[in-house]
């Protein structure tokens, strides 16, 4: 009896420690600010120390008797755990065979992060999956919302050269305009928002009662502001993908649509304000793709308000399921997008669609020369010997591999790229076919499990966040410091309901 009570006390201590770990990684760590933190060694050291400290503490608790609840780590039957092992194994192998093993170990050759990042993130994933309480996510989402609001406010202040904490004290104004972001560069902020905003918005969509609606509505307002200011095509793509998935779920009713209209009003109000500020106050810096809606802010706000009013006053408290219509709408949107991309790129004489050509036509200039990064990364991979095609050139070695491939023909533009600006292409080059296959296996296993566990607490918002990030990754960088932010909550898709 005494041993049972001791084991329960140790488990509760481990669960509290897992909660603290998640809060530290998701809510406190993103607020750590250093200049140009995509490559920040100090920031990497911070997250590595944070992760290893918590993981060692949880490991010590497990060693003296703390046991996870039944079914948390069924390694014999769980494809997700085997896939995680494959991701780690391929990362280790590609590091050992890297063009520079030392740089690949620590991830000092580029934005992507190295083998050490994969190792401590994998251990953190196992720790959270073993001990994190399943009902934690409501409180965690609120804390993530507060962090999102703070990050967004600091981001906006930096756009207008208001540097409250001296992040850019010795940085030229022009450089600030190019690299404005409270987290060093916009890529970190884009990746963080791609994962955090679906959590924040979903909490507002399902909030019941006035108190919860206000609590989650405030972060949702700042989430709308983030969409209007964060200069990243990937963020727009990610949020769009998450919305399409949401439309297909049975949760999508007239009530959900009404809340979406409120988020729409938040966004158009924020976009209109930012459009005014950029026009009359500050004209430097990048301009996000969604900021174009600032030109139609009044019309967009009015449409959202009208739809909300019709749904609220006409239906009162009734909820009408809309998920069937949502699936039709999602299918039409995806089909139309695919058809337009195929026609714009492969049909000779296809008429111009104006500014949409910047999105639909893939060439070297796409996304501020991101197309160049894709082309040279693919070319560098195809130039590798067969064994390197399988194992990769090593984490963080994209720039080195491109330089070796281009040789004397390397251009000034090529020299600026330290990442492929596409996570899947980056994995193919740095970790090879085996590394990419392992990551796809891991993601697929978790998405399949998420579909099965959709109604369990915490699964739906994490799944939408994962979908958003995976879409974002197709046109953006996996900034290494974001990797733990993604992997730890993803474990929620595999959590089982407590049995004791």
Model-derived segments and their meaning:
Residues 32-45, 169-182, 281-292, 372-373, ...:
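Juxtamembrane membrane-water interface segments that cap and precede transmembrane helices
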